[in-house]
Regions:
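Substrate-binding beta-hairpin/strand module that engages nucleic acids
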Residues: 14-16, 20, 133-162
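A residue-level signal for conserved active-site and pocket-lining positions in enzyme catalytic cores
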Residues: 1, 70, 89, 124, ...
Length: 163
């Protein structure tokens, strides 16, 4: 999705959001970014709910500033183990990194996702801290979030992680 474009619509206007999602999906299909099957299986209402969220608004503002980064691969050594992954999305906000991971898991409670993914997000945060270090000082990814499409909510994991 083109998050910059979200700044141009009223994300509380359900008709405008629905039209934005439809247009975005049509463009992705036309460009070959998604297949016909993916297009048919996508549940636009879940995407619309996300677009109307506060976290999507924050992402739109970051994208407008040029501070939004999507699908960034990384490789790092973590305690003698080579770790690689792809970070869904992160952005810079108030000289800090905000890290967000999208999840579609079938869960009934946020705690399930926190238990399942907080370590993964901590590793991603550590990788970003190394990437964005300047003069020996790391910019920290203090805010680590999961957006659950199933629960339709943003979940904070950063306070839950215990090393």
């Amino acid at each position: 999705l083109d998050f910059k474009s979200l700044c141009d619509i009223d994300t509380k206007d359900h008709v405008a959001v629905s039209a934005f999602v439809k247009k975005s999906m049509d463009e992705m299909l036309k460009k070959g970014l998604i297949t016909d099957d993916m297009y048919r299986l996508t549940r636009p209402k879940l995407i619309e709910q996300f677009i109307s969220s506060d976290v999507a608004a924050r992402m739109a503002q970051a994208d407008k500033r040029g501070d939004l980064y999507k699908e960034k691969p990384f490789v790092m050594d973590y305690e003698g183990v080579l770790v690689q992954g792809i970070i869904d999305v992160f952005w810079l906000e108030n000289d800090k990194i905000v890290l967000l991971d999208y999840k579609t898991d079938r869960v009934n409670a946020a705690k399930e996702l926190i238990d399942r993914y907080s370590t993964q997000l901590k590793l991603y945060a550590d990788a970003l801290g190394r990437i964005f270090s300047t003069d020996g000082k790391c910019i920290q990814a203090d805010e680590r979030l999961i957006y659950s499409f199933r629960l339709q909510q943003t979940i904070v994991t950063s306070r839950e992680y215990k090393k």
